[in-house]
Swiss-Prot record:
Disulfide bond annotation, renumbered to this chain: none
Naturally occurring in which organism (per UniProt): Acholeplasma laidlawii (strain PG-8A)
Protein known as: Large ribosomal subunit protein bL20
HAMAP family: Ribosomal_bL20
Amino-acid biosynthesis in keyword set: no
Annotated GO CC locations: ribonucleoprotein complex; ribosome
Record's keyword annotation contains Ribonucleoprotein: yes
Gene designation per UniProt: rplT
Upper lineage: Bacteria, Bacillati, Mycoplasmatota, Mollicutes, Acholeplasmatales
Function (record text): Binds directly to 23S ribosomal RNA and is necessary for the in vitro assembly process of the 50S ribosomal subunit. It is not involved in the protein synthesizing functions of that subunit.
Pfam families with a match to the protein in the record: Ribosomal_L20
Amino acid sequence: MARVKNTPVTRRRRKKILKLAKGYFGSKSTLYRTAHEQVMRALQYAYRDRKQNKRNFRRLWISRINAGAVQNGFKYSKLIHGLSLANVQLNRKVLADLAISEPTVFASYVELAKDAIANPAKYQVK
């Protein structure tokens, strides 16, 4: 007969994996080996997608800011450059939210950026 090696620890480890695999299709939720493979893959995807989520949101914010800038007759890159010249410390998340929810406020920021590009000396910090 085979020797049993530390059964309580093994059982706990396997139960933990099967608990994580709950809701998976077919044998991936009941058989330890396939469940373990699937859980490891799922955790890798989760790790990868937490990083990608940040990139995706930044892309979304940039496209929203660009759409708002185009509506006001400006480009995204010029808007960001003008806002940095004017020492405006708003991040892209806030700018995208303003472009959607407060178009008049966003338009005033576009005008500020246009003015900062036209008269950079006016906004120089001395």
